[in-house]
Regions:
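Solvent-exposed loop/turn segments at secondary-structure junctions
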Residues: 166-170, 209-215, 238-243, 275-279, ...
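Extended beta-strand solenoid/passenger and fiber regions
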Residues: 1-136
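Catalytic His-Asp segment of secreted/periplasmic serine-dependent ester chemistry enzymes
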Residues: 274-350
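Serine-esterase "nucleophile elbow" of acetyl-processing enzymes
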Residues: 131-206, 220-228
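Catalytic-core regions of hydrolytic enzymes
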Residues: 174, 200, 207-231, 241-254
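Short, solvent-exposed loop/turn segments at secondary-structure boundaries
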Residues: 173-179, 243-248, 281-287
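Active-site segments of SGNH/GDSL-like serine hydrolases
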Residues: 235-239, 259-292
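Structural recognition of the beta-strand scaffold that forms the well-ordered cores
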Residues: 159-164, 168-169, 203-208, 230-236, ...
Length: 350
């Protein structure tokens, strides 16, 4: 997929947040991650719409909340839309599914593998108010991933290889959906961000497969194990949360790493801890994503680093809501979510 410049979630030096995703609720409210002194821009790039303060929304300086004006052109999501009527809902795996079964309250929950959320969410640029404590990102330990860090420092070509599930394949980035603003999936943002920072060429090959868990990579190594690359990014979890315990997950990931090292002994690894699912959907207990990240940390070494997407996702979601960050309603990121993934990966090399 065509690469695009990585847009940081926030600019720490000047306190500006860029293209932060928002979803207005049925009461006409949307939450910013931080209090804002000024809204610089509010838009929906998929619809090609720019919204005006006063005409479409209001904001009180110093507040983290936006409110819709009566008659506003801004889309919103009501409770009735989140839980559609079971009699009329098209349930997944219907090809035109607009809902999925198995929500925690027994009612269908909104679902879309198309561009519904891209057309309904909006993006805000804003100046934060006062002193803001932006989330800290995990970094490599001293001496970790020495081969790739040396190649980046020396501006030598670097090749990334990604294996994972539908999130990593690209769902529901607008570039993957082929709708504006055509934001690439996170692996391409990661590669372009490394290129910009290092000044050397960084390319990415994506071998992720929709619907798979980590056992798939172990079962079908011919899809990825023979591909030459400096860094193997392993990003499973979402489809493993319900089918295995963290210890088995770690064991399978270790086997994947050993398969790779048997062919390319110099390979280094990033082990991605998945975003959590929508807790309004499914029967799994809370904390599964966090437990699986903990299992990955047990695999860290000089040649392998964990990238804890779950922690940053949870921190951001706590200040907003899941529907501002999701691309399908239940377990995929939107453009903002893909940027968040890339932010965590790039943060390792800061």
């Amino acid at each position: 997929m065509k690469s695009a410049a990585f847009i940081p979630l926030w600019e720490r030096k000047n306190g500006i947040c860029r293209s932060e995703s928002l979803m207005f609720d049925g009461e006409g409210r949307a939450k910013l991650l931080f209090p804002a002194s000024k809204i610089l821009k509010l838009c929906n790039p998929t619809l090609g719409k720019v919204y005006s303060e006063g005409r479409d929304f209001t904001h009180t300086p110093g507040s983290d909340e936006l409110r819709l004006v009566p008659g506003s052109a801004i889309p919103f999501l009501t409770e009735a839309m989140i839980h559609p009527d079971p009699a009329t809902a098209k349930l997944y795996p219907h090809p035109e599914a607009d809902a999925i079964a198995d929500s925690v309250n027994g009612r269908p929950v909104i679902f879309s593998n198309g561009d519904f959320f891209a057309r309904t969410q909006v993006e805000a640029d804003y100046q934060t108010a006062g002193i803001v404590e932006f989330p800290e990102l995990p970094r490599l330990a001293p001496g970790q991933l020495p081969r790739i860090t040396a190649k980046l420092r020396e501006k030598k070509p670097v090749k990334l290889l990604l294996i994972g599930d539908s999130i990593s394949e690209g769902y529901n980035a607008t570039g993957y959906l082929k709708v504006p603003p055509f934001m690439p999936p996170y692996i391409d943002l990661f590669a372009s961000g490394l290129t910009e920072r290092s000044g050397g060429p960084v390319t990415a090959v994506n071998r992720a497969v929709n619907g798979t868990g980590c056992r798939h990579a172990r079962k079908e190594p011919e899809r990825w194990a023979g591909e030459e690359a400096d860094l193997l990014v392993i990003a499973y979890g979402m489809n493993d949360f319900g089918g295995m315990e963290p210890a088995e997950y770690a064991s399978v990931i270790r086997e994947i790493m050993e398969l790779r090292l048997g062919r390319f002994p110099e390979t280094e690894f990033i082990l991605v801890g998945s975003m959590p699912r929508n807790l309004n959907w499914g029967s799994l207990p809370e904390g599964r994503a966090e437990a699986f990240v903990g299992a990955l940390r047990g695999l860290e070494s000089e040649k392998a680093a964990a990238a804890d997407v779950c922690a940053l996702w949870t921190r951001v979601q706590a200040g907003k809501d899941y529907y501002s960050m999701t691309g399908n309603g239940v377990n995929h990121p939107n453009d903002y979510g893909h940027r968040l993934y890339a932010e965590v990966l790039l943060g390792l090399f800061a």
